[in-house]
């Protein structure tokens, strides 16, 4: 059986091999590890999300990542980056379709990472 530290190292290595930066914050009192995954989207947005691992259960991390991925709505995320006229704001691409394409790319990035981390459980 793998130790929690070994699992953490494997997750970090897997994510980094897939182009992600990872911070892992251990909460000993709650017996959890919170992973924060970040990567730039094709349009340059610093995209990130967090997922939690319970104890040394890689399956709990995969489950939390699946929940995030399944709940990710590229349209809603794109809307957050649009101004009142439907143009990108805060460094987002100017055209609405480009903002949406960037959020769809982010969704694909999460999917690819999820598949890679899921592969660690095999």
Which positions does each model-derived feature cover?
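Intrinsically disordered, low-complexity regulatory regions enriched in serine/threonine/proline
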Residues: 32, 46-122
């Amino acid at each position: 059986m793998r130790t929690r530290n070994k699992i953490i190292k494997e997750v970090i290595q897997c994510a980094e091999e897939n182009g992600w930066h990872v911070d892992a914050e251990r909460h000993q009192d709650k017996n959890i590890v919170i992973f924060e995954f970040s990567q730039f989207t094709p349009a340059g947005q610093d995209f990130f999300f967090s997922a939690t691992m319970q104890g040394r259960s890689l399956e709990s991390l995969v489950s939390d990542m699946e929940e995030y991925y399944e709940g990710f709505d590229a349209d809603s995320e794109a809307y957050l980056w649009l101004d009142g006229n439907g143009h990108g704001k805060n460094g987002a691409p100017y055209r609405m379709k480009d903002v949406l394409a960037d959020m769809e790319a982010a969704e694909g990035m999460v999917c690819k990472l999820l598949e890679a981390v899921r592969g660690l459980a095999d």
